Regions:
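Mixed-charge (Asp/Glu-Lys/Arg
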Residues: 314
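Active-site bordering "gate/hinge" segments
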Residues: 1-301, 325-336
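Acidic, carboxylate-rich catalytic segments that either coordinate divalent cations
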Residues: 319-320
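A short beta-strand signature within small-molecule sensing/ligand-binding domains used
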Residues: 304-306
Length: 336
């Protein structure tokens, strides 16, 4: 047999190394090594919440907006601060905008490189969202800027239509990969992969389901909590999160093409989904997780959880993060 592996690891930030053991055209085993610095939250202990929040953007380059909003919501929950409906709407839009930017980047980098030049329009739109809504990125008790929220959101939703349309030549369900803009080389590769159905994926992560959330929180309170954040499971069973999991709560992914289509579907439906969120007659009051100091948000790569405990000086006593990558690259997870 032979082995092949990626070289994603960085000496400073770590990474995920996937080693594939194969014999001719059959994969015999997949080994996953995660060297990401999962104990980074130790830096937050005994620091004031304002300082911790200020550290978020520099510590987390990928999905930095998601990390910051998850942190804000966790701290607000721990401090008993209520997130108003307008702040929730603005933050949800920023989460949505960052997720879309990351998904489009993945699409044009990996599947449709001929559209790479159009990525700039999505980046510009995200920056516009940030400019219009950054008033919501402070603790809710200190926020002033809600008055013009609704018109700004309406305008951003209209702009998104023009941004997404040129990127996606086919929005029809079941369109061929070539019609969707997938490059010829990738189409051939996916056709070849289609002859070898994949095994069952890991179970679907759904932390809005109280049973899964409670099992996760119980593990975060156990002695091995730090290791759990590195290799999380639901009661010992690996789970998958991301665009495939969001759309296929009961189904399982047998073909790589199915997963590619789930990413494409989320991008094509983005304008419609943003519009329906914004045009709800009444902003719903934030539901949260119902657990003090805990927040769960959706990012491009999947579900992100922050859990914080504050001491009586309003400093961080304990901080825990479980990122989507740790679910999706569990040594016994879907990739295995």
């Amino acid at each position: 047999g032979s082995k092949a592996h990626n070289t994603a690891a960085n000496p400073l930030t770590g990474g995920i190394q996937v080693t594939v053991c194969y014999n001719r055209d059959h994969i015999k085993a997949v080994e996953i090594s995660n060297t990401r610095p999962f104990a980074v939250t130790r830096l937050f202990r005994e620091k004031p919440v304002d300082r911790v929040l200020a550290m978020m953007p520099s510590l987390f380059y990928i999905c930095g907006m998601g990390q910051l909003i998850a942190a804000l919501r966790a701290v607000e929950s721990a401090a008993g601060i209520t997130e108003t409906s307008a702040i929730k709407q603005a933050r949800d839009t920023l989460l949505f905008a960052e997720s879309l930017r990351e998904q489009v980047f993945s699409w044009v980098t990996n599947w449709a490189p001929q559209h790479k030049s159009r990525m700039s329009h999505v980046v510009d739109w995200f920056n516009q969202c940030r400019k219009q809504l950054d008033w919501s990125l402070t603790l809710a008790s200190a926020t002033t800027g809600e008055a013009g929220c609704r018109p700004a959101l309406e305008q951003l939703a209209r702009q998104l239509e023009d941004v997404v349309k040129p990127l996606l030549p086919a929005s029809r369900e079941g369109a061929s990969l070539a019609t969707m803009g997938v490059s010829a080389g990738v189409c051939q590769l996916l056709k070849a992969c289609g002859e070898y159905p994949l095994g069952l994926a890991a179970k679907t992560l759904n932390l809005s389901e109280s049973q899964q959330l409670m099992a996760t929180l119980a593990a975060l309170n156990a002695a091995e909590a730090e290791q759990f954040c590195h290799q999380p499971t639901i009661s010992g069973v690996p789970a998958e999160t991301g665009s495939w999991a969001r759309q296929n709560i009961e189904a399982r992914g047998f073909l790589i093409e199915s997963r590619l289509r789930s990413l494409y579907r989320e991008i094509t439906t983005a304008p419609m989904r943003l519009r329906s969120t914004i045009r709800q007659q009444q902003f719903s009051q934030t539901e949260g997780t119902g657990v003090r100091g805990c927040s769960v948000v959706e990012t491009a790569r999947g579900t992100l959880l922050h859990k914080v405990a504050l001491d009586n000086r309003n400093q961080v006593a304990k901080y825990q993060i479980i990122a989507p990558t740790e679910w999706n690259f569990h040594p016994q997870g879907s990739l295995k």
